[in-house]
A protein has these predicted regions:
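Active-site beta-strand/loop architecture of penicillin-binding DD-peptidases
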Residues: 1-10, 16-108
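Short, highly charged C-terminal tails/helix-capping segments
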Residues: 108-127
Length: 127
């Protein structure tokens, strides 16, 4: 992996603007919101679901997450074309990857099964 990915990157944006965003992402997972399935015992997970409209078919599913809240060890973004709502397709995938990365195990077999059984609609291409 390129060394640049191990180094903290800085922007020209004043860090004070990040605090309410991070807090909102933490609350979306831990207090209530569309991201509560992303909770992991012992970890302060932050996340945000998203749904991108798709005029050619089913909406796209997105989920952005990082953990722990203070001094993150992982940041992940999952985008599932035609996956529907962010919480229904992208979030479970991201959460399982995050859990495995942080803990070396998966403790939610029901979520693994849900991901395995999820049908993603792929429109016919090249008609």
């Amino acid at each position: 992996i390129d060394r640049r990915f191990y180094e903290k990157q800085y922007t020209m944006i004043d860090p004070k603007h990040f605090e309410p965003i991070v807090e909102g992402m933490w609350r979306g997972v831990n207090v209530g919101g569309t991201s509560t399935v992303a909770r992991l015992d012992g970890w302060d997970v932050c996340g945000k679901t998203g749904t991108a409209q798709n005029p050619q078919g089913r909406d796209h599913s997105t989920f952005l997450s990082f953990a722990p809240k203070d001094n993150p060890r992982i940041a992940i973004s999952v985008y599932v074309e035609n996956g529907g709502f962010g919480a229904s397709a992208a979030l479970p995938i991201a959460s399982l990857l995050e859990e495995y990365y942080l803990t070396d195990t998966v403790t939610r077999p029901w979520l693994v099964e849900m991901v395995k059984q999820k049908t993603i609609y792929y429109p016919a291409y090249g008609k």
